[in-house]
């Protein structure tokens, strides 16, 4: 069972999303935290053997340079270069934000004008099932990036052997649903507590994505950087009875 992921429009689109979660001026965000989230996100995609295009890797190398500069002793010349690199990055994100807002405004105007013209009905085209990167799904990936990093560290400390067992997404979907039996919701990180190796962690996550795609599960996150909870999607009849 394959799960395809649509990319962001580019690395700046991903960075803008990460920055916007802080709900403050772009130039005031903790840039080191943003860099770590970006690198963790890309690392997770690679661990899941999903394609990461070259432009994301180029940006990753630039971000690692900025991060490494911040770890160096505070020498005047180095500090100036570090500030230049950081300000240049933030300026790129700010410029991208403005262009994106302009694009959204123009698209809204286009849709408004389109309402004045009748259009012939178009045949609906269905592609292979894809999980689109909406904001909630992006936050899910970011949360999983942190979980995967912590589990890798845990396995390393416990000298856990990486087994070559073939975990099936279909089997893991059953496990995910069973984990919700008798409870209203499940905190995302609690789903992976009993996982024995990285492959099991990743397959559990893919199973979760599949259940979200098939609308058997929904995500709840009440605030930026808050815990993400999984909930079974109730049928309308169940909602009416509750």
Swiss-Prot record:
It comes from the Bacteria. Pfam families: SMC_ScpA. InterPro entries: ScpA, ScpA-like_C. Its main location: cytoplasm. It is found in: Cytoplasm. Disulfide bonds: none annotated. Keywords: Cell cycle, Cell division, Chromosome partition, Cytoplasm. Signal peptide: none annotated. GO terms for cellular component: cytoplasm. One of its GO terms (biological process) is chromosome segregation. Component of a cohesin-like complex composed of ScpA, ScpB and the Smc homodimer, in which ScpA and ScpB bind to the head domain of Smc. The presence of the three proteins is required for the association of the complex with DNA. Belongs to the ScpA family. Participates in chromosomal partition during cell division. May act via the formation of a condensin-like complex containing Smc and ScpB that pull DNA away from mid-cell into both cell halves. This is Segregation and condensation protein A. The gene is scpA.
